[in-house]
């Protein structure tokens, strides 16, 4: 199950969508990050077993992950 949250604190007022509770596999995280960035048309990064995307993209990310068969919370 993947979980989503939105963060602003400590980011200069910028909004970031964080996908966490993902499998601890660097190749998987990199591939998922690329996929989500393409699907949402935004930038992002992989950091400490999470995928961070620029902007409040929770709805788009939730829809994309659910289409791939993931259970999503948040």
Feature annotation, model-predicted:
Residues 1-47, 59-74:
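Long, charged, low-complexity intrinsically disordered regions
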Residues 50-55:
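A generic structural motif
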């Amino acid at each position: 199950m993947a979980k989503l949250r939105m963060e602003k604190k400590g980011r200069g007022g910028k909004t970031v969508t964080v996908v966490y509770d993902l499998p601890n596999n660097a190749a998987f995280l990199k591939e998922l990050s690329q996929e989500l960035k393409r699907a949402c048309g935004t930038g992002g990064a992989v950091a400490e077993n999470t995928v961070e995307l620029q902007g409040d993209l929770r709805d788009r990310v939730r829809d994309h992950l659910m289409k791939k068969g993931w259970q999503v919370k948040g």
